[in-house]
Every structure is written in C-alpha cells, then in structure tokens.
A protein has these predicted regions:
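Beta-propeller domains with acidic blade repeats across secreted/periplasmic ectodomains
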Residues: 1-175
Length: 175
C-alpha cells in the first residue's frame, strides 16, 4: 500500500536503470528479490494496513475513504480527484464510515480459538474513536458486504489507539 501524496520512485534490483514510479493510494506487489514490482490496484486514499483471507483475497483499511476495501486485481477505487479507467470504480464493500477517518489496521479472523460468531469477521482499528470494530460480512456472490460495524473493543482511555491488528500464530488477535 502506498499512502496519500507519497509519490515515490523505486529502483529495481538487477541490470539496467529500471525504475518504477509509485503513486499514492495504489497497491503493488514485489518479487522477494526486488527484481520486479507491479501495480495490483489503483486509487484509494491512504491505505493503512492489509490482510488476506483464507482464499487469498486481499483487503485494506483506508483512511479517508472506505474503512475496508476488498482489492480486486486491476480495480480502480475512489480517491481524491483520481479518475477511474472508464469502466467505473470497483464496488465498495460497505457504505458505513465507522464514525471517523482514522482507520488503521485490518485483520480477518480465520482461526478456531474464538467462538464461531467471531470467525470469518474483519477487525478494524479506529485510532480516533478508540475502538476496534468487528465487521461481519454478508456475502453477495463472491463479494463481501458490511452493513454496519459492531464494537469489539472500546476504551475510554485517551492513550488507547489501536494502530494495527494482526492475527497471531496462536489464534489470538494482537492490537
């Protein structure tokens, strides 16, 4: 993920002067040895956190647009003043903004340690409201849809700001 107003140039490893221009909001994939980089999606504003579900589908948490985005390879997503490719923007997976623009981190829970109702849900950190939201997807064909988030963890302590969420190898969610 590449954040808002962070246009960068990346030199690829190997022979020759191969340089790739990274544009803000887009997502990219790299070869482990640094010899190749390619765009996966275009748009978004400030993706801040990424996860993959059990089927290998990618999701991002994005500040200032949709809290969770299902990344469809080659898709264009709404951003500040950026056009789509002529076919329109990829479909959103929620109309709810989670009550802020400070979304940071997303994890999908696909382990077996939590009760069934908490599995296959998305967990999103909200650093403005001091909440970790649990987003329960309803599937519309192969596309997930989130009606509204449910508070999973909330804290009145002003120092509690969930900036990242990860699923650990032990099946626990780490904030």
């Amino acid at each position: 993920c590449h954040g808002f107003r962070n246009d960068s140039k990346v030199k690829l490893r190997g022979e020759g002067p191969a340089v790739m221009q990274l544009q803000s909001g887009n997502t990219y994939r790299f070869r482990p040895d640094g010899s190749a980089i390619e765009p996966v999606t275009w748009g978004q504003v400030n993706p801040f956190g990424m996860c993959f579900d059990r089927w290998g589908d990618a999701y991002t948490a994005d500040c200032h647009s949709k809290p969770i985005t299902h990344l469809v390879r080659g898709g264009y997503y709404e951003s500040f003043g950026k056009p789509h490719d002529g076919l329109g923007f990829a479909p959103p997976m929620t109309a709810h903004d989670h009550d802020s623009t400070g979304i940071a981190g997303v994890a999908v829970y696909d382990a077996a340690q939590y009760p069934a109702e908490y599995r296959d849900c998305f967990y999103v950190g909200n650093v403005i409201t001091n909440v970790v939201h649990r987003d329960v997807p309803q599937w519309r064909g192969s596309s997930p849809w989130i009606s509204a988030p449910v508070d999973f963890v909330s804290c009145p302590d002003p120092w509690f700001h969930p900036v990242d969420i990860q699923l650990g190898p032990d099946g626990a969610l780490y904030l």
